[in-house]
Amino acid sequence: MPFRATVLTLYPEMFPGHLGVSLAGKALERGDWSMEAVQIRDFAGDKHRTVDDTPAGGGAGMVLKPDVLARAIDHVAADDGRPRLLMSPRGRPLTQERVRALAAGPGAVVVCGRFEGVDQRVIDTRGLEEVSIGDYILSGGEPAALVLLDAVVRILPGVMGNQLSGVHESFEGGLLEHPHYTRPQIFEGHEIPAVLTSGNHAAVAQWREATARRLTAERRPDLLERARHPKRDPPQPVKK
């Protein structure tokens, strides 16, 4: 069954956005994956279609109401087994590992936050997994949702023309990607590294590995540290 994305948002016109063009757009037209953008306001219970209210305890901004969002989630998700994701700056960082896990599943329900945030009770009762795309604040969850779905859709079977393109990329092997070069041989006095035009495939692979490790050490030493000390599952209690 194709990957199915359902996005809950106050701005459904923002979707599919850039995912409606290029390889992702062609795959969408072919039915390799599907997207539905659902207006949260449609689940408000008053004539003004109110979706937010003032924060309990005071403070600036407004909070997305739990009853409205819960009705929206229940309507689109029910018990279909798809993970329910809330785009949030306080969520766990999105990683390529999580992206691969999502791509291997049936799809996702993605909730786009707005205002000051979402009432914690709907997060708890509807099992929303908070996901962050970085340590910065956006005006809403829609751009973050597009980033997440872009990362997932591009590695779905049949989306990329060359599946190897998705294998030799940053983060796929725990390293940043090596530099790329193409013709002309000399550009403004700078030549393509000789090893890349030597025809020696083993030497090319070795050069790419070495430069990837150097770049990772310079720019993302945390990735190397993570590879040296992978997370392990906590020990399970012995059953007597």
From Swiss-Prot:
Main location: cytoplasm
Region (Disordered): 215-240
Keyword tRNA processing: yes
Pfam families, per database record: tRNA_m1G_MT (PF01746)
Basic and acidic residues composition bias: residue spans: 215-227
Record: residues binding S-adenosyl-L-methionine: G113, I133, G134, D135, Y136, I137, L138
Catalytic activity: guanosine(37) in tRNA + S-adenosyl-L-methionine = N(1)-methylguanosine(37) in tRNA + S-adenosyl-L-homocysteine + H(+)
Keyword set, alphabetical order: Cytoplasm, Methyltransferase, S-adenosyl-L-methionine, Transferase, tRNA processing
Keyword flag Phosphoprotein: no
GO biological process: tRNA N1-guanine methylation
Localization (cell): Cytoplasm
InterPro entries: Alpha/beta_knot_MTases, tRNA_m1G_MeTrfase_C_sf, tRNA_m1G_MeTrfase_TrmD, tRNA_m1G_MTases_N, tRNA_MeTrfase_TRMD/TRM10
GO cellular component: cytosol
Domain of life (superkingdom): Bacteria
Gene3D superfamilies (alphabetical): 3.40.1280.10, tRNA(m1g37)methyltransferase, domain 2
GO molecular-function terms, A-Z: tRNA (guanine(37)-N1)-methyltransferase activity
CDD domains named in the record: TrmD-like
PANTHER family attached to this UniProt entry: TRNA (GUANINE-N(1)-)-METHYLTRANSFERASE
Reported function: Specifically methylates guanosine-37 in various tRNAs.
Family membership: Belongs to the RNA methyltransferase TrmD family.
Subunit structure comment from the entry: Homodimer.
Protein name (record): tRNA (guanine-N(1)-)-methyltransferase
Record organism: Rhizobium meliloti (strain 1021) (Ensifer meliloti)
Lineage per the UniProt record: Bacteria, Pseudomonadati, Pseudomonadota, Alphaproteobacteria, Hyphomicrobiales
